[in-house]
Amino acid sequence: MSMFLDTAKISVQAGRGGDGMVAFRREKYVPNGGPWGGDGGKGGSVIFRVDEGLRTLMDFRYNRKFKAKSGEKGMTKGMHGRGAEDLIVFVPQGTTVRDAETGKVITDLVEHGQEVVIAKGGRGGRGNIRFATPRNPAPEIAENGEPGEERQLELELKILADVGLVGFPSVGKSTLLSVVSSAKPKIGAYHFTTIVPNLGMVRTKSGDSFAMADLPGLIEGASQGVGLGTQFLRHIERTRVILHVIDMSASEGRDPYEDYVSINNELETYNLRLMERPQIIVANKMDMPEAQENLKAFKKKLAAQYDEFDDLPMIFPISSLAHQGLENLLEATAELLAKTDEFLLYDEADLVDEEAYYGFAETEKDFEITRDDDATWVLSGEKLERLFVMTNMERDESIMKFARQLRGMGVDEALRERGAKDGDPVRIGKFEFEFVD
């Protein structure tokens, strides 16, 4: 079985928009030709698309950087530059995408073909044909292309198994999976033989089929990182039915009922919603001595926790090694799956509104002013820096336009209030100029 990569850290960068062009119409018999510079093309966006054929995040181990192409520059005759194609990145079903800096969930990719724009391409800069006015019919102004969005992301794969096997190490989960499916998990008589999830397709005699995941063994304290810890608890978040496998022979000296309670406590501690999933108790190793007596004691303790009118969890005595009781277990599992809906991983309120990434929040500051040790005033802020990088600093008219934009944003007034004097150095990024009062 292929290794399942649970998480991957990658960077994505959308393409920059193409620069607008400064050009003028110069043709014979056309006097006083006006501006003729076209707009730059848009930069390519980075789009994640779900491919149900992918089962792991293995590809992201070797390719961690994804960069879309930039748009082409504007041309003469008012022609626009060609926009860049979007970069499509294929991800498995069940991939959760988080912002690595904030930890917020950006999107949950669960449907085949689902697409989400992860990083938006930059807008193409406007050519000088766009800036013509009656007062300035021949402007030497053009914008640089807007930079594309850049992000650091964390990908997390939630296995899309219908049924998850949970239980203490060495209770027989791997053996059960190998017997009822074509999966070939590593099997051993020691703890944590399974260190990665194994998936197998199960088909019942009645023709029903479902995916079953043999998940690494849980121990008490797993939700706090003990043993194999929380990295594997996340795998059962998507399973619709949980098969709780218990070693009813108590071959390692533990009480079967205490095992049952301990594992359920870990599931509840990790995520309260896990306990909403229906559970079937699988009493394994029933071919071993004392298993029958232990099962009687288990049922008695379990019943004591319920009112007489409550429905007790289903219990199926089996032996994976002896192939006993498996057919009834699988048929009951298929029936339970048929009437169990999928569970949402997150409340809708936890998902980030995509608009928050493609616009500016009303409460966001347009700029910030700090002062370096060398007495230089430093201007920063997403909106201000965006205007700066889209300004062609090689043309005087563009610089004057940028100065007017700063004045309109209130930068000049804010500098005066902070004590800036005529001739003080001011810096935006690596560009430095003098403050003129």
Curated annotation (Swiss-Prot):
One Pfam short name: DUF1967
Single GO BP term: ribosome biogenesis
Domain of life (superkingdom): Bacteria
GO cellular component terms attached to this protein's record: cytoplasm
Principal location listed in the UniProt entry: cytoplasm
PROSITE patterns for this protein: G_OBG, GTP1_OBG, OBG, OCT
GO function term, MF aspect, one: GTPase activity
Enzyme kind, highest EC tier: hydrolase
Every Obg domain range: 2-160
The protein's required cofactors: Mg(2+)
Residues involved in GTP binding: 167-174, 192-196, 214-217, 284-287, 319-321
Residue span, OBG-type G domain: 161-338
Residues that coordinate or bind Mg(2+): 174, 194
Location of this chain's protein in the cell: Cytoplasm
Function: An essential GTPase which binds GTP, GDP and possibly (p)ppGpp with moderate affinity, with high nucleotide exchange rates and a fairly low GTP hydrolysis rate. Plays a role in control of the cell cycle, stress response, ribosome biogenesis and in those bacteria that undergo differentiation, in morphogenesis control.
Similarity annotation: Belongs to the TRAFAC class OBG-HflX-like GTPase superfamily. OBG GTPase family.
Protein's name in the database: GTPase Obg
Organism of provenance: Streptococcus pyogenes serotype M12 (strain MGAS2096)
Gene: obg
